[in-house]
Amino acid sequence: MSASPLKVAVTGAAGQIGYSLLFRLASGSLLGPDRPIELRLLEIEPALQALEGVVMELDDCAFPLLSGVEIGSDPQKIFDGVSLALLVGARPRGAGMERSDLLEANGAIFTAQGKALNAVAADDVRVGVTGNPANTNALIAMTNAPDIPRERFSALTRLDHNRAISQLAAKTGAAVTDIKKMTIWGNHSATQYPDLFHAEVAGKNAAEVVNDQAWIEDEFIPTVAKRGAAIIDARGASSAASAASATIDAARDWLLGTPADDWVSMAVVSDGSYGVPEGLISSFPVTTKGGNWTIVSGLEIDEFSRGRIDKSTAELADERSAVTELGLI
């Protein structure tokens, strides 16, 4: 184990997702049993004492791969030299808050973090945004980090992707490992479009295996799109462990690559593919290799799918307009 440690920053590190995420990172879930990890943990001042308690627990695990932990509230210090930044912390929507209020509150956070990453992160940095509204938070951070290539920013739609795989597996009786080429299009919101028309179940077209358009429209899509709300209703708190697991999955596949016979969903900056307006951070089917992603090309988009994609990307365009008017980008 002679490899130099990967410096990984996690924001909102004392939060619920952070609590699930840090122990997975430290145990080797990201890059396997041979690559040490150095954790750089960012929190707001009032949460630093709680974060110290989490670090005590990390110490008590005696993880062989955890080479060091640094905590603080200054992104300029915490992001210094990091090669992977997982931006988990975000202002949750409170009672009486409009979506514009949420965008404004998070805008200040992601503006500051984008500028700090631009100033001090490693040249090879990759930035994954989990904190919601993730797509537009990623857009704000990206815009405020002009020296970092735009393709180094991604927002998390892997949780939606994993949810879609799970629902399709349950419907068809297949193992989750039998399902390939699932796609999430658009925003990480209730307008997202989980698309199984290109997916495969044990090598066969998923839509043909299901053979039930009503189930696709009335059950599959809304169940995936509204799963977060269903978990809040059941658990009394938002999904945290599953979001952390998806954050690991997304970062691992980004850094290590996707299998030859599969793709994943990532929200990345649009180049105009599939009619998604250029510059929006929207979810696409992508393959990854060597730390770089490529949008899967040449997929046929039928009229039903077109309408769903357009609805979600219109929401993203509205969010972009809102943060532009707020002077955040």
UniProtKB/Swiss-Prot annotation:
SS bond list: none
Catalytic activity, EC: 1.1.1.37
List of residues binding NAD(+): G12, A13, A14, G15, Q16, I17, G18, N106, Q113, T130, G131, N132
A GO BP annotation: tricarboxylic acid cycle
Domain of life: Bacteria
Alphabetic keyword roster: NAD, Oxidoreductase, Tricarboxylic acid cycle
Transmembrane residue ranges: none
Reactions this protein catalyses: (S)-malate + NAD(+) = oxaloacetate + NADH + H(+)
Claim: NAD is one of the keywords in the record: yes
Entry's Gene Ontology molecular function annotations: L-malate dehydrogenase (NAD+) activity
Binding site for substrate: R93, R99, N132, R163
InterPro entries documented for this protein: L-lactate/malate_DH, Lactate/malate_DH_C, Lactate/malate_DH_N, Lactate_DH/Glyco_Ohase_4_C, Malate_DH_AS, Malate_DH_type2, NAD(P)-bd_dom_sf
GO CC terms of this entry: cytosol; peptidoglycan-based cell wall; plasma membrane
Record: active site: H188
Function: Catalyzes the reversible oxidation of malate to oxaloacetate.
Similarity remark: Belongs to the LDH/MDH superfamily. MDH type 2 family.
Protein name: Malate dehydrogenase
Gene designation per UniProt: mdh
